[in-house]
Amino acid sequence: MTQETLRKLWITLAILTLVVMINIHGSTQKSDFALIIKLPIELKFDGELTREAYAVHGMRFFALFFWLVPFLAVYHAKRSSGSASEAFPFRLLDIEPRSRPGKWVQGIAFVVLICLPLLTAIHLWRIVVGMQVCQHVSNALVNCADIWSRPVNAGPWDDTYRLANWGPTYDPLVEPVLAVILTAVSVYLTLRLVIEMRRAGSRPVATGNTPAEPITTSVT
């Protein structure tokens, strides 16, 4: 895969992730603002969802998909050389990443496409850890407790646990542990990205194969 193809793949995934996270963040605040991207498929939540339900779905999306954004960026940076700003896979028109304006553009893109989703995840996580999860027994919710409690040995795909107030199905202990692990992976890859960008800046620019000097002969 060429660097150009990798950048196209990365920017597509990064923008889609950013749009979803911003929309979910706004939904937890009951905001009417939403970013819309026309796609062959539609990701849409029920307008009647509670704040906690949006937070649960947002953390699921973040944990499952966001780690790919810094992962691909790390892969791009490891194949780059000559400039830390050029190692970041964002490109805006024909602005040279090594130039002064280019460095500002790359820095802003890093904050928006990498840092903002992480900050949104922190916001969603603060909502999730304060939730109550209840056992679903005979069309009733009983034995409500926090997300780290699991009094019944239920399977991860059944309807044993739901959020209080008849929210979505949520598997306590299992889901938060997986979310913490995958979020930690995302944070690690983000830190690794910064390191690889610095390393790229210290590597000499790859110039490719230089043509051999012509052989000259002199006749005396």
UniProtKB/Swiss-Prot annotation:
It is a multi-pass membrane protein. It is found in: Cell membrane. The chain crosses the membrane at residues 9-29, 54-74, 105-125, 177-197. Coiled coil: none annotated. Keywords: Cell membrane, Membrane, Plasmid, Transmembrane, Transmembrane helix. Disulfide bonds: none annotated. GO terms for cellular component: plasma membrane. It comes from the Bacteria. This is Uncharacterized protein y4fD. The lineage of its organism: Bacteria, Pseudomonadati, Pseudomonadota, Alphaproteobacteria, Hyphomicrobiales.
